[in-house]
Each structure stands twice: as structure tokens, then as C-alpha cells.
Amino acid sequence: RQYVAQALSDEAELSVAGQVVPLSVFCDTGFHLQEPLSGRAVVLVRLDAVSLPTELRAYLDACLAGVGAEPRPEWGVRFVPCQTVAGHCLLPALPAALGSNGRKQDGIYAAFCDMPPPPGGWTALVSAETAALLGK
């Protein structure tokens, strides 16, 4: 099976935790993360690429470092299982919306990872299904 990644738009915006964050979004046809309880779509966001409130950022950093931390209930944190060639992990995720090309997908989750900047400079990955809903 061949996987394809392509840039969607330099003007995508993620609404998360009361913030609107600009993203460089890539569509990866091999990307299939879903929030397990609701089955909702997930956008994978590089944590270092976005600006979030200090307390929330500290919580997400602790989660990704494997340090137990208690989230504030109003954040609505869920954990999304992720399987890669490097192994299995649980990524912290927050309720979000993603907009691009005049379209918006509400009711999704933004899962955060701590990976270094990849080639192409994307800050978020979406599935082909999410890309189609955004008009790509």
C-alpha cells in the first residue's frame, strides 16, 4: 500500500482551548487516528508548533514526558491510542475544530505529539477523510 502526504493549505486554523492557532496542514492517506470513545476524527498537532495557555501547555508537556498529571475537567482531555513504527503510545487530545478554504470541521479532537519538525514543515496531519471534508 502506498501512502501519500500532501499540503492542504497554509491558511488552516485550529480552534482549541479557546485559542485559534494557524497550522500548516498535511493530508496523509495512511493517517487514521480516531478518538476511541466517540469515533471522532483526530488531527495530529506538533505541540512545539502551536501557542497554548501556559497551564495547558505544561499539562501536555507532562503527558508527553510520561509524567502523571491531572487535567482540568473543562479541558475535556481524552487519550488517543497511536501505533507507529516506533511503538504504541497514548496521545493527549482536546476538543477542537479545524478550518481551511472557507470550510470548518467541528467536533474533532486535536491530539498532540512532541516530534521534531519534519521535512516539509507541517504542524498538523489529517486523514484523507478530514481533508475531503475541508474541500481538498
Stretch-by-stretch model annotation:
Residues R1-P36, A41-L44, S51:
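Canonical alpha-helical transmembrane segment with a positive-inside/aromatic-interface signature
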Residues E11-S15, Q19-T29, A62-G135:
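Aspartyl protease catalytic core from the pepsin/retropepsin fold
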Residues G39-G76:
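Electropositive
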